[in-house]
Amino acid sequence: HTPHNPPTELFDKYIKLAPNEAVAKYWAMCEWFDKTVGDLMNYLKKNSLEENTLIVYTADNGWIQSNKQNRYAPRSKRAPHEGGIRTPIMFKLPKVIEPEMNTSTLVSNIDLVPTVLDFLNITGEKLSGISIMEKDKLNARETLFVECYHHDILNIEHPTETVLYKVALNKKWKLMLPNTKMVVREFTLPDEQYY
């Protein structure tokens, strides 16, 4: 997230490689994030907490750094395209979660709470999401719904006033319903570019 203000030594490393200062700062921020996650993991291991700590990582939106401006590129943040809505969701718990990279199962941040409750062996009330541990239920999910908002909710009583897009997607198709000033567009997912 902005502001991109990495340590000087990381910025100096990437300014020689990047097309411009904004991209160098973004790349340096990525490495800085990796380092701080590594520091956390080392702390947990050093203090014998690693095997009893559930690590969860996710993001609220995608971000593709623009090569031309100090901001996100089109078709990423606040956009219904893959670069804007396809974000990582990662869980780590040694001896419980097997490492896996899965880019085809329909999973969303609404699945975070059911998953954490599942790990804690807590039966929650009916929730919208599905625990990632319930693979059969996840695989049976046919459609995922997404909303892309303007940066701020301007009217808390009517948050849908700032919805830019509503999206329904399955493993093959994505339907993007923009606000009334734009047209409805449909894509075949494998053909859509990430940026």
Language-model segments: residues:
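Histidine-centered active-site microenvironments of extracellular/periplasmic hydrolases
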Residues: H4-P6, Y43-P99, S108, L154-N155
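A hydrophobic, helix-centered structural microdomain
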Residues: H1-P19
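A short beta-strand-to-alpha-helix junction
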Residues: E21-T36, L49, P74-T87, I97-P114, ...
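Short secondary-structure boundary/capping segments
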Residues: T8-K13, R71-P74, T160
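Acidic active-site catalytic centers that drive phospho-/nucleotidyl reactions
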Residues: D34, N52, D60, D111, ...
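C-terminal cap/loop subdomain of S1 sulfatases and analogous C-terminal strand-loop tails that border
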Residues: W63-Q69, E98, T105, I110-V113, ...
